[in-house]
């Protein structure tokens, strides 16, 4: 039987370009966050921040940005430049971000599009993404994060080959699958409190420990270290 706890905490969540970058069912990550949040006594107030809208780095406790089709991602790549300064401020102030697929790419310097064009990201993180000719990384994937002692499961489907840069470390080491680029045995990224990944599934629906970790981090940022949360079954 599910037990909901009376809310003692609140988190404000920005779903960046949620009306455009929503192709792969990764909105399920927000459903998962809300599911666990209710069990932990947390109310999540979410809103979409899209094109022509300002991003306020002081308003939000959590940011989610997913992936989309090529056309929509190009639109977003142009608009997100107007949010570059505020997003970078949010990141450098230890704001929590979960970025998936195209959203992950856009936080870096650039990615190569379907027609070979170079599409600028915001360069808040030091990675870049190349493309593959007539090939995609597709299939089940499993990684292990040694720092947290956690294993994550998902499904990857991407043409991009992402290479991490200074200050970045992978979300995990490949146990099964291809990961960021098929070469260095890493998948995803962690930089400060930014988590990026190519995992679909959605990632949080299949990896409870990661979902709870993100919620804990956002709460500690907002309320300090003394956060009293119930243990989840």
Where are these regions (language model features)?
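Structural motif
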Residues: 62-66, 98, 196-198
